[in-house]
UniProtKB/Swiss-Prot annotation:
EC numbers, comma separated: 4.1.2.25
Active site positions: K99
GO molecular-function terms, A-Z: dihydroneopterin aldolase activity
Any one of the GO CC terms: cytoplasm
Catalytic reaction(s) noted: 7,8-dihydroneopterin = 6-hydroxymethyl-7,8-dihydropterin + glycolaldehyde
GO BP term (any one): folic acid biosynthetic process
CDD domains registered for this protein in UniProt: DHNA_DHNTPE
Protein family according to the UniProt entry: Belongs to the DHNA family.
Pathway stated in the Swiss-Prot or TrEMBL entry: Cofactor biosynthesis; tetrahydrofolate biosynthesis; 2-amino-4-hydroxy-6-hydroxymethyl-7,8-dihydropteridine diphosphate from 7,8-dihydroneopterin triphosphate: step 3/4
Name this protein carries in UniProt: Dihydroneopterin aldolase
Keyword Lyase belongs to the record: yes
InterPro entries reported in the protein's UniProt record: Dihydroneopterin_aldolase (IPR006156), FolB_dom (IPR006157), GTP-CH-I_C/QueF (IPR043133)
Length: 119
């Protein structure tokens, strides 16, 4: 299956189980892999034959920056739901969400989740 990839999208949001996360917010890193049939676009060179990743980015940004979720698992699920609703050609989605600085003790590069959904 063909894929459209958005990697390292950075957004500021207020998601998390801790009060500090909900009031102070933090940066969220989002990676997306969208399974789409790109056959027509690969032949036509027309934007109308693909999924516009700029619009995908804006859609995800609105959810991450405008919504509030306790769990990033739920945020990821909401991203999948929204993208499936907005873009019928998307057949499957893999989304990864990471927090670089959650309020937990320890040394790590990031913590996060990854989920995959199919239409």
């Amino acid at each position: 299956m063909d894929k459209i990839v958005l990697e390292g999208c950075r957004f500021y949001g207020y998601h998390g189980a801790f009060k500090e996360e909900q009031t102070l917010g933090q940066i969220f890193l989002v990676d997306l892999e969208l399974s789409v049939d790109l056959q027509a676009a690969s032949l036509s060179d027309q934007l109308t034959d693909t999924v516009h990743y700029g619009i995908v980015f804006d859609s995800v940004r609105q959810l991450v920056e405008g919504g509030k979720f306790i769990l990033i698992e739920r945020l990821a699920g909401a991203i999948c739901e929204q993208l499936f609703n907005e873009f019928p050609p998307i057949e499957a989605i893999k989304v990864a969400i990471k927090k670089e600085n959650p309020p937990i003790a320890g040394h790590y590069k990031a913590v996060g989740i990854e989920l995959e959904r199919q239409r």
